[in-house]
Amino acid sequence: MDLIGFGYAALVTFGSILGYKRRGGVLSLIAGLFVGFLAGYGAYRVSNDKRDVKLSLFTAFFLATIMGVRFKRSKKIMPAGLVAGLSLLMILRLVLLLL
């Protein structure tokens, strides 16, 4: 079972809900829930086959790119820098699973 992947998905999902409660951005909530769902489904697929990392890798790369740009623009660690950093760690972990 890919507990790290499921934890990453839960963090993304929880973060989108928390962001919605603080700022009220409906589109941000929908996008965050969708990306969290993709990360969770990717973790489920990795749980069944350790080499099936395509969806998880795509999701982490997408989130690292989007949040990395936001972090570069805002220079704020929370939430953009944290999510970008965690996404980069997920990418590294998933690549190592392929080796």
From Swiss-Prot:
Keywords: Endoplasmic reticulum, Membrane, Mitochondrion, Transmembrane, Transmembrane helix. It is found in: Mitochondrion membrane; Endoplasmic reticulum membrane. One of its GO terms (biological process) is regulation of heme biosynthetic process. The keyword Membrane applies. Signal peptide: none annotated. GO terms for cellular component: endoplasmic reticulum membrane; mitochondrial membrane. It is a multi-pass membrane protein. InterPro entries: TMEM14, TMEM14_sf. The chain crosses the membrane at residues 1-21, 24-44, 79-99. Its main location: mitochondrion. The keyword Membrane applies. Pfam families: Tmemb_14. It comes from the Eukaryota. Inhibits apoptosis via negative regulation of the mitochondrial outer membrane permeabilization involved in apoptotic signaling pathway. Belongs to the TMEM14 family. This is Transmembrane protein 14A. It comes from Bos taurus. The gene is TMEM14A.
